Design a protein with these regions (language model features):
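Internal "kinase-insert"/substrate-recognition segments embedded within catalytic cores
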Residues: 16-24, 37-38, 56-65, 70-177, ...
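Short, glycine-/Ser/Thr-/acidic-enriched flexible segments
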Residues: 22, 40, 86, 106, ...
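Zn2+-dependent metallopeptidase catalytic core
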Residues: 45-59
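Short, solvent-exposed turn/loop segments enriched in Gly/Ser/Thr/Pro and often Arg
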Residues: 1-2, 67-72, 208
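Residue-level detector of short, conserved catalytic/binding motifs and their immediate flanks
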Residues: 15, 33, 66, 79, ...
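Middle-to-C-terminal accessory/interaction subdomains
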Residues: 6, 10-11, 127-129, 133-269
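Extracellular/periplasmic catalytic domains that process cell-envelope and extracellular macromolecules
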Residues: 7-11, 26-29, 61, 70-74, ...
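Conserved NTP-binding catalytic cores of kinases and kinase-like/nucleotidyltransferase enzymes
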Residues: 1-44, 49
Length: 269
C-alpha cells in the first residue's frame, strides 16, 4: 500500500492487510484492513475528518485511528480507512456483481503519467483505457465505455447510467475541501465507479490524505499558496474538456444549481 508514502527503508510504512489465509477469517467483520502512515499530514486529521464529512452526503469509507504494533514493537499512530471492495459495495449499495472500476492508473500516477481516469471517450476499443483504469469485476469495460460515450455525445441521457446527484456531491465535496488528489485535480483519480442494479454508476471517493489543500495541482495551475487554495474557483474545470464529468454535468443549468446548493450545504453544515 502507498504510492508516494511507501519507502522501503523507513520503519513506519503504510499497510494493506488481507485476512484471506483462512476461510471466513475476519477482524470485527472486516477482511481487508488498510492503514495509512499519515506521511503527509502532521495534523493527523485530513483523512479521518474528510471521510466523516463525506459520509454525511454520500457513500464513503468509515475511518478511525489505530496504534500499530509489529512483533510487540510500537510502530506509531496510523489512520485506518475501510477498504473499497466487493464487500463494501455489497454493504452500502446492496450488490456485488456489477461492473466495478478503480479509477486510478494501475501503474500509479506521477509526473510522467500520460493516461488518466478522466472519463474522456477514446472510442470503443477497451485497450485504450487499460493504462488509466483498473477493472475490479470480471467484466465491465463495455459499460464503462458506454458511460464515457454518453458523457461525450448524449448528456441528456446521462441519468440512465450515472447517479448524477452523487457525482455532483463528489464534485462539491472535492471543491469545498480543496481535495485535488481526486477527479478535480491534475491526475483526475482516486475514485471508484460501481454499476448498481438499476444500471447507474455510483461514484465513491477515496484516498483523503492530501485533502484540505495539501495537494496543489489543479491540472491547469498550481495553487502554491494558502490564499490561492482558499480562493480557488467554485467552478473549477467547468469549461475544460479534459474533465468531462465536471464540464458536461455543469453545462446543464439544473445540475449546476444542484452542485452549488451542495457546496453551500457542506459549507453551512
Amino acid at each position: 500500500k502507498g504510492n508516494s508514502t511507501y519507502q522501503p527503508n523507513q520503519t513506519k510504512n503504510p499497510w494493506h492487510i488481507e485476512l484471506d489465509t483462512y476461510k471466513n477469517q475476519d477482524y470485527q467483520g472486516f477482511t481487508d484492513i488498510k492503514l495509512s502512515n499519515v506521511a503527509k499530514d502532521p495534523s493527523f486529521l485530513r483523512e479521518v475528518l474528510s471521510y466523516k464529512i463525506a459520509r454525511k452526503y454520500m457513500v464513503a469509507p468509515q475511518a478511525n485511528y489505530a496504534v500499530v504494533y509489529v512483533n510487540g514493537n510500537q510502530i506509531g499512530l496510523y489512520t485506518s480507512a475501510e477498504s473499497i471492495n466487493k464487500s463494501f459495495v455489497d454493504r452500502y449499495l446492496y450488490s456485488r456483481k456489477g461492473a466495478f472500476v478503480k479509477c486510478n492508473p494501475p501503474a500509479g500516477a506521477g509526473p510522467g503519467t500520460s493516461s488518466y481516469p478522466d472519463l474522456v471517450f477514446q472510442g470503443n476499443d477497451s485497450t485504450n483505457y487499460y493504462a488509466a483504469y483498473e477493472m475490479k469485476s470480471d467484466a465491465g469495460w463495455a459499460e464503462l465505455i458506454h458511460l464515457m460515450d454518453t458523457l461525450a455525445n448524449d448528456i441528456n441521457a446521462i441519468e440512465q447510467i450515472l447517479q448524477v446527484d452523487q457525482a455532483l456531491w463528489m464534485h462539491a465535496f472535492n471543491n469545498v475541501l480543496v481535495n485535488l488528489d481526486s477527479y478535480a485535480g491534475g491526475f483526475k483519480q482516486n475514485y471508484y465507479l460501481y454499476r448498481m442494479k438499476n444500471h447507474q454508476f455510483y461514484p465513491v471517493v477515496w484516498d483523503m490524505n492530501e485533502s484540505f489543500g495539501k495537494f496543489s495541482m489543479t491540472g491547469t495551475i498550481n495553487l502554491s499558496s494558502t490564499t490561492s487554495k482558499a480562493q480557488m474557483t467554485h467552478l473549477l474545470h467547468a469549461n475544460d474538456a479534459s474533465w468531462p464529468l465536471i464540464r458536461k454535468l455543469l453545462s446543464i443549468p439544473m445540475y449546476r444549481r444542484m452542485y452549488l446548493a451542495h457546496m453551500k450545504t457542506i459549507i453551512n453544515e
